[in-house]
Regions:
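Conserved ATP-binding/catalytic motifs of P-loop helicase motor domains
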Residues: 1-197
Length: 197
């Protein structure tokens, strides 16, 4: 069962991260969970979050190890588990006025504290996230993890990321998709047994 495989891969990675002496000791995981509508992507994420909570005793997600976000409030609400919008999580509330948080500012200190324990980011409805948005997310996560332990020069500040969605669904608004959906059209038609080896 591919849902179980997905969950086992993530649980194993999280276990390694929790046992590591510092954040930089385990390379971040980059995982895409793609499928057409109704294939169980969101249910897989919900099951994963329940498993993480139970197996690793992570407690409440808000402000902790796992952050779940989506481009829209509706998508975030559908996942639950403390999910929020990407704009809210990464303090991008003025769409055309993105700027780095100033060094030594109270805003940056508060953001770093909020993200301090975060080691796994789950982004739902990834088809709606464009190159510019992903760049802003990476910029913010790098700012949140900038320390002598983790210089924050890795994409996403060294935070593991699971991107979930249907590449053939809604494209980003006023942005360019950061992956080419046409490359995935044939893949999404293949039987699961052929894709997962």
């Amino acid at each position: 069962d591919f849902q179980r495989l997905f969950i086992e891969i993530v649980l194993k990675h999280v276990e390694l991260v929790l046992k590591a002496p510092n954040a930089a000791a385990v390379p971040p995981m980059r995982l895409m969970l793609l499928g057409t509508a109704g294939t169980g992507k969101t249910q897989s994420v919900k099951t994963l979050l329940q498993e993480l909570k139970r197996a690793l005793n992570l407690g409440h997600y808000e402000g902790h190890f796992v952050r779940v976000a989506a481009p829209t409030g509706c998508a975030a609400f559908n996942v639950r588990f403390g999910a929020t919008t990407l704009h809210c999580l990464f303090q991008m509330l003025r769409p055309n006025k993105f700027a780095e948080l100033r060094e030594d500012s109270p805003e940056l200190a508060a953001f770093q504290e909020k993200m301090r324990a975060t080691r796994l980011l789950i982004i739902d409805e990834i088809s709606m996230v464009g190159k510019q948005m992903m760049g802003k997310i990476s910029s913010r996560t790098c700012q949140s993890k900038n320390s002598k332990d983790n210089p924050g020069d890795d994409i996403l500040g060294g935070i593991s990321c699971i991107a979930v969605g249907d590449p053939a669904q809604c494209p980003p608004i006023m942005d360019t998709a950061f992956f080419d959906p046409s490359l995935h059209k044939d893949t999404l038609k293949e039987p699961d047994a052929i894709r997962v080896k």
